[in-house]
Amino acid sequence: EIVDAVIHHLQKEKLPTVPRSIRHKYMSAFLLAATSITGMDKVVPKVSGAESWELTFKLCRRWGYQVKQIPENECIIVGATGNFHGRTLAAVSMSDDPDSRGDFGPFLPGIELVPYNDIDALKKLFEEKGDKIAAYSVEPIQGEAGVIVPDDDYWPEVQKLCKKHNILLAMDEVQTGFGRTGANFAYQLFNVQPDIIGCGKAAGGGILPVSFVAGKKEIIDTLTPGSEGSTFGGYPLASVVGVYAIKTLVDLKLAENARVRGKLLMNHFNDIKNEFPDKIKETRGKGLLTAFEMHDEKHLDGHK
């Protein structure tokens, strides 16, 4: 259906490529679909997943200055160790992966990391510097780090801390969104509601690069003319693909499919683990975002 929509619009409607500043009905339809599926107030279309996280980062900073009234140039964004948000300068500034950071410094200031899934470390940092922290920006389930699923009570406790200290909960759903974990968005598995999310990858239905940021009105509205832009974000064909990707997610019940098939896959993983306990240390995951960890460390580095 997504491919058919692309062919139709290319052949019949001959869609041009126009910058996001030029409004058109296709982008309006995409923004409406994206706000509906996310339950957020507003959406900003982008192209790549890294772009969506980069804009999330910028929006959190701007909200910190304009809404929370953090002193100029003192805003802090907190991330988690083992994170992966892309390979832009802001993303590698937050990364603790030496392969991503090597010879790309100096890095952006105003970033601090806490161990992932460590509520005590986060609480300590919030208590020490909460008045200057704008956001905790993090993956609901860490992907690149090895499909790290946090404890069941982690995210509810994080949300309580964020509300207590007036800190945004910003989630990177680029890898985890669009049904992959058994829910439309992974945060829904943990019964929390982030203030802003970044989406990409499957948002383009496997056809075109499509991404977006969805958030609360008070965050998105900090953008002003000239403060943000995109040549290809939300251009007509990408908007068509975005609409049909969301339609496919809902109509084909892809989240439910991932949940059912994920259980089958995890059962197979556990069978293999039971057969080779000396080789497989652990199985873990949610839906079809799954992994098994080997005992032998020489098999753990996917880059080698």
Where are these regions (language model features)?
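Conserved N-terminal phosphate-binding loop of PLP-dependent enzymes in the Aspartate aminotransferase
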Residues: E1-K304
